[in-house]
Regions:
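Sec-dependent N-terminal signal peptides of Gram-positive bacterial secreted proteins and lipoproteins
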Residues: 4-22
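N-terminal low-complexity, Pro/Thr/Ser-rich intrinsically disordered segments
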Residues: 23-27, 195-208
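Structural signature of tandem-repeat unit edges
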Residues: 24-32, 41-58, 68-81, 90-104, ...
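Consensus positions within tandem repeat domains that build extended binding/scaffold surfaces
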Residues: 61-64, 83-86, 106-109, 129-132, ...
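A structural signal for leucine-rich repeat
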Residues: 111, 134, 154-158, 179
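Short, surface-exposed terminal/edge motifs of secreted or surface/virion proteins that either
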Residues: 174-180
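STAS-like cytosolic regulatory interaction modules
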Residues: 180-201
Length: 288
């Protein structure tokens, strides 16, 4: 009897080890950049871990869940960005939980996720790329929690009749305009709540190398996904962005340049391959 019990316990331990090992093998993770680059699991209900190999998961990479047989997806409170097509054509996906940390939903995310019935867009989201949530045939309820993000063309288009976006009362006009500009026919209605304000401008002044005498940012040493460059640094106005100042920053997806900026130097944003949207100020005079 004792031998049988020991054997059963041993087999249970073995199964547990195999399961844990299998879960670890589900992910293709780039620790150098905090990017989840691939999913090798069996589908079903999927919970993405906040850490892999001791490093945080900051970005869901291009096409990670494209066409996968997942039924629900929970993303951790570390994820800042969904890259292009990260989650799309998932025909069985009925539920998704997006984290409050999320800032950027890049183009074609949730495209043709035909079983998805509702979604909540967290307050920190600043940008939703083109064709995201397009052809979601069952999506009837979209809830926005924060200030109106930039919404690109064809987002939330070709949804079922009666699809409704519930938005903060104090942002109603902004959302109506954003949906109209995107070409969406979704009904935009007040949610009964005001916008949750999230301060995520993406910088600390020490991350900029700045020449105060000329007002020039000469380099940027941060890792922001969304960056709103300040009008002043150390009390001096920002007038120029120097040559190659932001070159090869692979995290940067959304950029707002400040009023007062006049010049952008040569190759200032060279090889920023994930940069999806830039807001230019009215004061800009020259781009190198």
């Amino acid at each position: 009897m004792k031998r049988k019990l020991c054997l059963i316990l041993f087999l249970l331990m073995l199964v547990t080890c195999v399961t844990a090992s299998g879960e670890a093998a589900d992910w293709n993770y780039d620790a150098n950049y905090g990017i989840l680059r691939g999913y090798n699991g069996a589908g079903g209900d999927v919970v993405v871990p906040g850490e892999l190999d001791g490093f945080t998961v900051d970005v869901i990479g291009v096409s990670v869940f494209r066409g996968e047989t997942i039924t629900s997806l929970t993303l951790p409170e570390t994820v800042l960005e969904l890259r292009s097509n990260a989650i799309s054509t998932c025909d069985n996906l009925t539920r998704v939980s997006l984290p409050q940390s999320l800032v950027v939903i890049n183009r074609m995310n949730f495209f043709s996720c035909t079983a998805l019935t509702e979604v909540t867009i967290p307050a920190g989201v600043r940008y939703i790329g083109d064709a995201s949530f397009r052809y979601c045939e069952s999506l009837r309820k979209i809830t926005f929690e924060g200030v109106c993000p930039a919404i690109d063309i064809d987002c939330f288009s070709l949804l079922p009749e009666g699809a409704t976006a519930y938005v903060p009362d104090d942002q109603l006009d902004a959302y109506i305009a954003a949906f109209e500009n995107a070409g969406s026919e979704v009904s935009v209605q007040p949610s009964g709540k005001n916008a949750v304000i999230v301060e995520n401008n993406g910088y600390v002044e020490s991350e900029f190398d700045f020449d105060a005498s000329t007002g020039t940012i000469t380099s940027y040493n941060g890792y922001a996904t969304y960056l709103s460059i300040p009008e002043t640094i150390g009390g001096a106005p920002v007038k120029a962005i120097g040559p190659e100042a932001f070159a090869q920053h692979t995290y940067l997806a959304l950029l707002e340049l400040p009023e007062g900026l006049e010049t952008i130097g040569d190759r200032a944003f060279y090889n920023c391959e994930t940069l999806a949207r830039v807001h230019f100020p009215s004061t800009l005079k020259f781009i190198g």
